[in-house]
Amino acid sequence: MVDDPPTDVILYVRGALFDMDGVLVDSTASDERCWLRWAQLHGMEGSFSIHSPHGRRAVDTVRALRPDLDPYVELRRLEDFDAEDPSGTSALSGAAALLAALPTRSWVIVTSAPARLAKTRLQFAGITVPHNLVSVDDVSRGKPDPEPYELGARKLGLEPSECLVIEDSPAGIKAGKAAGCKTLAVYPRTRSIRWWRPIGSFHR
């Protein structure tokens, strides 16, 4: 049973570590299009679930689904699919304004996407590419391993315990908590996790 979230929560932190897809940017349509196109290419459309890749590195998903393929070749293919047609990608309401209101060096985007893809999606969604970005290219182990969020904290010159992670996927939430960060889940997909709070926009 999931505990009801408290009505008001005050967290004292010095830095914010934002996941990208599903938190700042809604890339669901683009993601589905790319993964389904990839699944069709490899004759997997009948057995593929679009929910399985969410929050994890594409190379890890490819390894799990098709260990016979070179995951880095397939990663590049997926990037190309997305670059060809990023339509449907948009910023979550209020996300750009929130980021603009924060001191530039007080926050980091920590994403399971490659840097090239992350920048494409942010630009298409109208969000300025940040000074600090941790992508899959920067780590040897992706979420749910804590390495991405540990690196995000280091980029701010902070301890993980001084940072708030904002996440929407179970893998990302586990990564934030394992890193020792305060961790906030912001999407109903995570109702199986004990910490969650639904959010439709960043205006409140």
Where are the predicted features?
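N-terminal helical cap/lid subdomain that shapes the substrate entry/recognition surface
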Residues: 4-103, 114-116, 127
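Conserved SAM-binding loop
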Residues: 24, 51, 107-110, 141, ...
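Short linear interaction motif-like sites in intrinsically disordered regions of transcription factors
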Residues: 36-39, 108, 196-197
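Short phosphate-binding/catalytic loops that engage adenosine nucleotides
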Residues: 105-107, 181
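Asp-based, Mg2+/Mn2+-dependent phosphohydrolase catalytic module
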Residues: 1-14, 96, 100, 115-204
